[in-house]
């Protein structure tokens, strides 16, 4: 597993979509943990709110507005399909919001985002073949400022 699940984790999910990963995160979280789910689509945000979990706050805005400090940040955002400036703004926001021992978990279907990730993070990756199509899971931690 890419993440340890101690009691009071502060978690963010970027691009929560229709809640497939969100439900799995909520199932793993302790009663004292919190989840901020970022979803830019108000239609999808409504579906997330329907999960009705008091530990979760749905934020209907772009992931570039991530702020505060998190222990774990999950992202399924298709980084390469985003405009360069937005991609950089999101990665900068993640870097700034990640606690000193925090973990950023990025799901991607290509390895072409590695140069972007490397500017901000030290990472290791794992191929998930059960996923269709197969995906890369990047487990990233902060390194010195870019």
Label the predicted regions.
Residues 19-23:
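Glycine-rich SAM-binding Motif I of class I
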Residues 48-49:
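Conserved SAM-binding loop
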Residues 64-73:
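A short acidic, Gly/Pro-enriched loop at the edge of an enzyme's catalytic core
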Residues 41:
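Conserved SAM/SAH-binding beta-strand->alpha-helix loop
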Residues 7-17:
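Conserved class I S-adenosyl-L-methionine
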Residues 88-100:
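A short glycine-rich, Lys/Arg-flanked "PGG" loop and its adjoining helix->strand segment in the class I
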Residues 101-108:
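Conserved beta-strand signature within the Rossmann-like core of class I S-adenosyl-L-methionine
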Residues 53-63:
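Conserved SAM-binding strand-loop segment of SAM-dependent methyltransferases
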């Amino acid at each position: 597993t890419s993440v340890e699940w101690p009691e009071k984790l502060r978690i963010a999910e970027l691009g929560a979509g229709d809640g497939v990963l969100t439900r799995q995160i909520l199932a793993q979280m302790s009663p004292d943990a919190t989840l901020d789910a970022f979803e830019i689509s108000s239609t999808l945000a409504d579906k997330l709110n329907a999960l009705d979990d008091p530990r979760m706050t749905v934020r209907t805005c772009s992931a570039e507005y991530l702020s505060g400090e998190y222990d774990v940040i999950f992202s399924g955002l298709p980084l390469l399909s985003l405009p360069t400036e937005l991609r950089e703004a999101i990665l900068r926001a993640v870097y700034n919001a990640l606690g000193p021992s925090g973990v950023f978990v990025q799901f991607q279907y290509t390895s072409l985002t590695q140069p972007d990730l490397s500017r901000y993070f030290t990472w290791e990756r794992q191929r998930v073949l059960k996923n269709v199509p197969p995906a890369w899971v990047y487990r990233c931690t902060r390194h010195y400022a870019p």
